[in-house]
Amino acid sequence: MLGLPALYAIVDPLDTRRPPAALAAALLAGGARLLQLRLKPPISRELLAAAEAIRPLAHAAGALFLVNDRPDIAHAVEADGVHLGQEDLPVAAARRILGRGRIVGVSTHDVDQARAAATAGADYVAVGPIYATTSKEHPLTPRGLELVRAVRGVVACPIVAIGGITAETAPLVRAAGADAVAMIGALVRAADPAAAVRAVLAGIG
């Protein structure tokens, strides 16, 4: 079974205008050992250029590197895997593009979706939003820690909790059953993203 670092750091500049590669470097400097590249809107050339810049940084630091939504770009840059949304390609199709030995994770928002993703062979399921988030244009209703507990009861694969998680709430989310906590805004909007990573890791190990 896949072993995930406790912090799942998402590289998305949001409204900061920080270059993705610079953000990635800062997160890695703080101790992040898993990065997912997420750009909205996902313009292909921009996503490819950012992925090409970040993958060597991640691998030099001994970190896993995933690309959001796009298994083709993940394959092109030899990323460690891809993260799929509910409207993206099925797990099996993504695996055909990526080849063997790559990670495929899936976003889920309820127990049924999580069970379906695990049954389809996802290496991990992301569940959320746990808390209110400002990182999505049209956020769903927060589901709270109960969603983590419920999904933990029906899947054997690792669970990544996402949505409005902060350094203060991350330990609670882990205690509810999440193997990892995914964070965007609390890291990339911080004045010092590296320090923000260190603060999170100090609480969750």
Placement of each model-derived feature along the sequence:
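Conserved N-terminal beta1-alpha1 strand-loop-helix module at the mouth
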Residues: 1-88, 96-124, 140-146, 150-159, ...
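C-terminal binding/interaction regions
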Residues: 176, 180-183
